[in-house]
Each structure stands twice: as C-alpha cells, then as structure tokens.
Amino acid sequence: MKKHILTLVVILFSFNGLIGQEWQTNLDEAKEIASIESKPIILVFQGSDWCAPCIKLDREIWSTDTFKKYSSENYVMIQADFPKRKKNALSEAQTTANAKLAEAYNKNGIFPFVVVLDSKGKVIGETSYKKTTPENYIKELN
C-alpha cells in the first residue's frame, strides 16, 4: 500500500509542470518555498474584477501555457488581489494580508503592479502590464 501511495505522489509531482503555476497568497509561505527551491518570487498586485490592464495581463501572460509552464519551474507566484465585486470578496484575513503587502511593496497603489523579490523578500525588480508576448515578459522578469 505504501508503495502505491509513493508512486502516486511521484506521478502527481511530475505533472506539476504541466498543470501550471500555483498561486500563493501568503508571503511567508512563498518566501519559504522560494528559499527551499532557490527561486525568485513574483508578487502580483491586481484588481481581478475591475482593472482592465490587470485582466489583460492575466489573459495575455499569466494564463498562457507558455507562462504557466515556465513559472511553475522557475518562480514562486504570489497574488495580492483587490476585487471590488461582492461575489469576489476575499476573507477578512486575506484582505488584511493583501493590504499589508501593498503597504510594503505597492505604496503608490499601482494596478497591475508586478514585483520581483528574492527569497528573503527584497525587491530585485518591478514592472506592470505591457502589450507583449509571454516570452518577452519572462525575459523582462528575469
């Protein structure tokens, strides 16, 4: 039985790259993963239900197979969303956590705003929405 479970776990982990990036919502957890896996963190500030450039960035970059595959292997992705519609409301705890992230990394309230961090949370780059290909956006993040 243990052998079957171990085999299943190995199979699931090998499909991780095919499934796409996994979005974190907690910076401490993202930093821990980034430290263990030696990856930079991509912190995305967005208004998923009201910010037109945020929606374009999701559709044209984050949701593409090219970016999903690359990011799952090379980045730890964290999302700080600020939705306005009631149906998309976040928990109070997540809203507070996102506000703290904005205080630390997005003081000017820019949307979308993409911050590249090292595994300790130090800013190593910033960008926003650009009409470009996923490949070129990846080059900019790197």
Identify what each model region corresponds to:
Residues 22-24, 67-96:
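Thiol-based oxidoreductase modules, predominantly thioredoxin-like and allied folds used
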Residues 1-22:
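Bacterial Sec-dependent N-terminal signal peptides
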Residues 42-43, 77, 114:
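Hydrophobic beta-strand anchors of alpha/beta hydrolase catalytic cores
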Residues 24-41, 71:
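A short beta-strand-turn-helix
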Residues 97, 103-104, 108-142:
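Non-catalytic, surface beta->alpha helical segment in thiol-disulfide oxidoreductase systems
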Residues 37-51:
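Short active-site neighborhood of thiol/selenol oxidoreductases, capturing the structured segment around
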Residues 54-72:
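Typically the conserved alpha-helix immediately C-terminal to a functionally engaged Cys/Sec
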Residues 51-54, 114:
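The canonical Cys-X-X-Cys-His
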